[in-house]
Each structure stands twice: as structure tokens, then as C-alpha cells.
């Protein structure tokens, strides 16, 4: 299906945030930053929050309500606004229905959705499938790439199939609680234990002795029944963004680096949730201090990873730079957009400011439309 015809004037963008995942608060913070930076001369914004139990709510979209304040994380509640529904009918593409005690009120249709959702039930293909069914264009990757990019098992399977450099890992499916001797010897110590379909370092543990493994697996399983145990990769943490333009052209951003080890007592080098969002305990170098040939290789690998997963619109690819070269760690199909997030910073370093970056994403989504492609 092609994109809807646009009436003269501004494009109506629904920014959807919150959601049912453990990354609810970070999604809210990302949305606040996006709401603050969407060009009001080009875009009319509709802010839609999703509560932790899955209710859709039309909010006032004030960015100041979506910030971390004195360590308190923001959240969407049913009191945040009017409950909404999105009819899954292409003949009503973008139509919103405000729910109430009566029959409901039909609201003006949106032209495009910006799903600023991190983690399961948002970044994993679920809302993308809903929007495809409803015939509403949306920012970011489609159903398959979103699902594959969210699941660390399948991300690495697809990257490996394309011959891209990845680290070693073992998947613990439901009912499997530990590693066997061969797996322990293969991975070595330390290892990182993660929910297979999670982000923002939530539920992640660094294990330095095998007797710590059961507790780490139990923590990860609070967020996902499928758990990943990754071999530690010794190297610098680098990131690179990929952006698709309306004409289908792909570009890679300036390369950035995250430095944690030795910063404010974080000698373990573990970039966890608190370090990312609460303690301001990481140093971000944009551009990264690497040789030009290394930066070029990172940028090329980022585009190859983007293509291997089948991404669209945007993604951030995370690397370790080892003595033997770059290793791809993860791909994020909807990276963070907070004030400290690397994705907008890396593009700004290359000359694309935040409002221009957001406009390019929306324009690409509209040009792409929905349906098989």
C-alpha cells in the first residue's frame, strides 16, 4: 500500500511511547527528546503513550513530563490522558478513536507513526505488524527486521550467515538453567548473561565465577524466559548509526565511543542501566579517537549489518574494537533518543542536527508506505 495523500500544511505525526517492556521509562525519555526536537513548522505532533499494561492514551505531549527528575523515572498511566484505539482497517488509515463512556469520538487521522518504543511489545515487530495491518506508515524497520534485531539469538545467526564478525554465545531456552562443561570451557570467564530480547542493560549481569551463573540467569529470566550467555569480548566499545533516506540511500554516521572503565569508579567497564541513565558515569567520545581506516571499516560493517538484518529507516550498530579487528555486539532497530543517546550525537557530529535527522526519518517512512516491498 502506498502512503496516504497529504493535505496542504503540516504532516501529522503520532509519536508513540512507553509500552509494556521493562524499557518503558527510557522510551518515555526518548519520546520527550523527540517531541522537543520535531520541527513544529513541518509537523503537527500527536503524543500517544502506552501504559505498562498496554492501554493507549492520548497525552498532552509535554516534554518536561517525560524526563528523569531527581532519579525518578517517568511513566505513562491511564490518568495521563484519554484512552485511544487504532482501528486495524486500511480504509481508515491513520484514524484514531478516542474511547469514553459513549460510542467514542473519531479523531483526525495521522499521516505517519513514530514508534519510540524500546524492547518487547514495541521494538520487536509487534507494533510494526499492527501498523502494517492498519495501513499506517511508520518510522523504522518492518516486522521481520524488528523481530530479528530484538532477539540476540537470531541477530547473530543472520550476521554470521553474512560472514560478519560476531562474538560467541550460548542460548538458554526455558527449562535450561546452566551451561555444560564444554560450553563453559568454550566461553571462558567472565561472561555476560542477558535477556535474549531486552535492552538498556536491564537484567544483565557480569559473571566472573560459575557459581554466580544461577543468580544471573534468574535475574535475566525476570525479563525473558530465553537467556543469552555471551563470552566477554575485550575491546573498546564503539557505535555507528545507519540512516536510510527517502530515495533508499544508506549512510553511516560518525563513529562514537563509550568509555566506562576507570570513570567514576567503574573499573569493571560494565555499561549498565545506572551508568547509562542515572549516574552520568560514562564518557562519550564523538567522534571516536580511532584511525581513519578503522572508522571506515566500522561504517562499512554497520551498513552491512543493517542490510543483513533487513533494516529500514534507521539503526545503531554496536561494536567491540579488539586487537584482531571489530566485532559486532548488537544492532538496535530503534536506538535511544535521550539527551545523552549516541545515535543523534553521532549524526550531529557529521553535520545532521537533531531536527533534520528526525525529519529525514519521517520523510523516509512516508516515502516507503506500508505493505510488501
From Swiss-Prot:
Chain sites annotated for binding ATP: 184-239
Similarity-based family: Belongs to the D-alanine--D-alanine ligase family.
GO MF assignments: ATP binding; D-alanine-D-alanine ligase activity; metal ion binding
The gene coding this protein: ddl
Keyword S-adenosyl-L-methionine tagged: no
Coiled-coil annotated residue ranges, if any: none
Protein name as it appears in the record: D-alanine--D-alanine ligase
Predominant cellular place of this UniProt entry's protein: cytoplasm
Cofactor: Mg(2+); Mn(2+)
Binding, Mg(2+) 1: 318, 330
Protein purpose: Cell wall formation.
Binding site for Mg(2+) 2: 330, 332
Location(s) in or outside the cell: Cytoplasm
GO BP: cell wall organization; peptidoglycan biosynthetic process; regulation of cell shape
